[in-house]
């Protein structure tokens, strides 16, 4: 028996363990959708799947609670599939290898899926438990949140109805979120005709790894290094001083994760090899100094490899490296009226160059529409000047905070009564689905909260066990004390 099954509350953790056994990376949700539909039938609640792939449950009010405001419980079913470079794991087939480490639940070499698996299993536990007190409940478990909030965007009017939305996708217990940033994807592409490499040159594979990475909204203001940006600094110098040519570039693999690793293959004249190898060591030390106390495990190495036949033409190489080097990345500015809360940022998430094609993906976030457009226009200019075709997609507005929210007032009072302290009220610099769902179901009073998770979207992701009990107890109390209509 897995040790997770003995954790409290057991009815939550048993469902989480079941979830870890079912592959559910974004874009491959058939198995989890079937599982959730079957679960709904087994526990006797109305359940169905809509055209966007979302799963919906409906549970009637407890007798005597019919006069309470109707609540929508909301979470997303997909997870970010990230693994360490040397971890053997197929996210479309393999279960997540979970284990308990003190007060934390972790995975071995992969993302854990507590984002947003903990929200899903809290919903499952509530749907299953016939002893709870609550008003009319609807559960909305959305599809493909991590890759573009496609389930939320595909939700049609009339599919779900309610007066209160409790989003269970926040990651710090004791915090209530009343607003979030909007976002927009930018993709720059280019096709080019490759040139032959110089047969006298030497090929080197240069690898950067060991960075912390993280969620490109929540952790963008923490000062974590971006692997693509560091590699651009290296490339800029070896092109200028060592006659380096570029064969390929692979950095990052998720639009909403700060890239932790990057690998390029370059060619240089034989006379420059030792200088380049020495410079690799110098770069590692410089970056360790620059990111002291933030990035403790930077590894920057180079090794000789077989000489490829083809490479990126010189002019294209220069344009691409210059654009990546100049591309705005990280925090643009903080919200002037809310201390320490990022307003606008962007993440140079993915760079793929090789075999005659280049593709670069950036995700920009902002709680202010004008600043989101400003930042993405600057990024678009960088890549347009490099001769790339640039497309924007998936734009969504933020969720405007309402400090006078009735459910906010009720939940603050409930939390204080339960735990003897007042929860923090915040705005999050990440894309929650609340704003999108709120546009489909007008008039919703919305709050987002959840248990404590650390390092989501990375193999270091972990979930704090004691916080899960507090989160679940608070959720049950919120449902029991939902305001009357």
Give a label for each model feature.
Residues 12, 336, 343-358, 422-474:
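Zn-dependent metallopeptidase/amidohydrolase metal-coordination segment
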Residues 219, 226-228, 233-249, 401-444:
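Active-site-adjacent substrate-binding region
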Residues 23, 95, 103-106, 146-147, ...:
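Midchain, well-structured core segments that form catalytic/ion-binding scaffolds
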Residues 224-241, 268-273, 318-325, 332-333, ...:
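His/Asp/Glu-rich mid-to-C-terminal helical/loop segments that flank catalytic regions of hydrolases
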Residues 65-147, 152-163, 203, 318, ...:
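Active-site metal-coordination/substrate-binding segment of hydrolases
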Residues 341-430:
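Substrate-recognition/cap regions that form aromatic- and gly/pro-loop-enriched pockets
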Residues 3-103:
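Acidic/His- and Gly-rich active-site-bordering loop/insert found
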Residues 74-76, 140-142, 165-169, 207-209, ...:
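Short beta-strand segments
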């Amino acid at each position: 028996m897995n040790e997770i099954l003995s954790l409290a509350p057991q009815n939550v953790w048993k469902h989480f363990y079941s979830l870890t056994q079912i592959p559910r990376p974004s874009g491959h949700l058939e198995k989890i959708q079937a599982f959730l539909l079957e679960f709904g039938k087994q526990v006797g609640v109305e359940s169905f799947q809509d055209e966007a792939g979302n799963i919906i449950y409906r549970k009637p009010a407890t007798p005597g609670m019919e006069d309470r405001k109707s609540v929508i419980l909301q979470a997303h079913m997909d997870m970010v599939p990230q693994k360490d470079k040397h971890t053997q794991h197929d996210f479309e087939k393999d279960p997540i290898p979970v284990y308990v480490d003190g007060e934390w639940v972790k995975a071995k070499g992969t993302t854990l899926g507590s984002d947003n698996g903990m929200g899903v299993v809290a919903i499952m536990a509530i749907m299953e438990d016939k002893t709870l007190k609550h008003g009319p409940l609807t559960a909305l478990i959305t599809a493909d949140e991590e890759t573009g909030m496609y389930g939320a965007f595909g939700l049609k009017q009339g599919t779900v109805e309610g007066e209160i939305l409790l989003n269970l996708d926040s990651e710090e217990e004791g915090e209530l979120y009343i607003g979030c940033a909007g976002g927009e994807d930018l993709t720059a592409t280019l096709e080019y005709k490759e040139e032959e490499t110089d047969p006298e040159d030497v090929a080197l594979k240069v690898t950067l790894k060991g960075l912390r990475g993280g969620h490109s909204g929540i952790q963008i203001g923490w000062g974590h290094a971006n692997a693509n940006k560091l590699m651009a600094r290296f490339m800029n110098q070896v092109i200028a001083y060592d006659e380096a040519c570029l064969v390929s570039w692979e950095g990052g693999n998720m639009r909403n994760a700060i890239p932790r690793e990057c690998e390029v293959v370059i060619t240089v004249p034989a006379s420059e090899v030792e200088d380049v190898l020495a410079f690799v060591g110098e770069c590692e030390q410089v970056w360790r100094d620059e990111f002291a106390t933030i990035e403790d495990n930077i590894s920057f190495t180079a090794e000789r490899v077989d000489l490829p036949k083809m490479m990126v033409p010189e002019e294209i190489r220069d344009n691409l490296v210059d654009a990546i080097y100049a591309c705005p990345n990280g925090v643009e500015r903080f919200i002037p009226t809310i201390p320490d809360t990022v307003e606008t940022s962007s993440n140079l998430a993915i760079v793929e160059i090789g075999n005659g094609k280049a593709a670069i993906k950036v995700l920009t976030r902002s709680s202010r529409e004008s600043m989101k457009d400003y930042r993405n226009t600057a990024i678009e200019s960088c890549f347009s000047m490099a001769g790339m075709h640039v497309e924007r997609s998936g734009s969504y507005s933020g969720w405007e905070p309402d400090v006078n929210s009735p459910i906010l007032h009720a939940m603050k009072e409930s939390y204080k009564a339960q735990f003897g302290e007042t929860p923090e009220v915040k705005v999050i610099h990440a894309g929650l689905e609340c704003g999108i769902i709120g546009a489909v179901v007008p008039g919703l009073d919305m709050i987002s909260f959840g248990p404590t998770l650390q390092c989501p979207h990375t193999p270091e992701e972990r979930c704090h066990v004691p916080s899960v009990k507090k989160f679940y107890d608070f959720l049950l109390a919120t449902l029991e004390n939902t305001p009357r209509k």
